[in-house]
Amino acid sequence: MSMHWDEAFPIIRLNGAGAKDFLQGQTTADLRKTVHGRLQQSCWLTATGRLRAVLELRLDDDGADVLVLAGDADAMAQGLDQVIFPADRVRMGERRLQRRIQALRPDSPAAWIDDESILPSEFAGSRRLLSTELEERRLRLGFPPGPAELTGNTNPFELGLAQCISLDKGCYLGQETMAKLAGRGGIKQQLRCWVSSNRLNSGDPLFDGETRAGVVTSILELESDSLVGLALIRRQYLTSGALNGPNGQMVTLERPELFQDPPSPD
């Protein structure tokens, strides 16, 4: 039986003719050719390129909906509100929750539907994932990042979100750092999924011999008594098939299914 992701996410509403241009300068995706009604994933960064939120944007004739897939929606709403000026021709609208569904295939598009809507025909016979199942899939996919990955110290390239980053659309919040990282290949660590039959905790260091190679971020205990999680692994150890925890625990590394490689330097 096929399964699908069905969850409600917070929406930040922006009203006004300037919503598209405003988001063009505040988020990482190039919206110049985005068709109204089509979902566009993007990121919201700090001025120094740290990831604050993963977004799904939908433009319309009256403004834009900003769905926060990962991150603090309240902090983002406050942050956007603080940088809106009269010349932007945009204003904050009402907040709401939006139901979002997506089949569990790497190339499957997402859809926004009403709370009481019948599932589209392509979901016939599909089962909604339970919360634990959904978390396991998130860890194996590497998307969306969770609170343990959104610490304020990571950038989108480290978390496999290169597809959300435009390097040629012009100036936006965090753009200078993204360009520098892409130009010199300066990604020091990358996200990896891991599995282990031994107990680990979030924040535990991972080692290659005596050398620190990474750190555990997310963790989930499965019914089989094994564990699956995410970790940030230093660049020089990305080809390692296994590392050890702080007490010698064996940890097997896997590339997350949806991880997108960071751009290579010219």
Where do the PLM segments sit?
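Short, intrinsically disordered, mixed-charge
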Residues: 24-33, 78-86, 183, 208-211
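Glycine-rich, small/acidic residue-mixed loop/short-helix segments
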Residues: 50-51, 55, 137, 159-165, ...
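Short, conserved charged micro-motifs
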Residues: 18-23, 73-77, 118-124, 200-204, ...
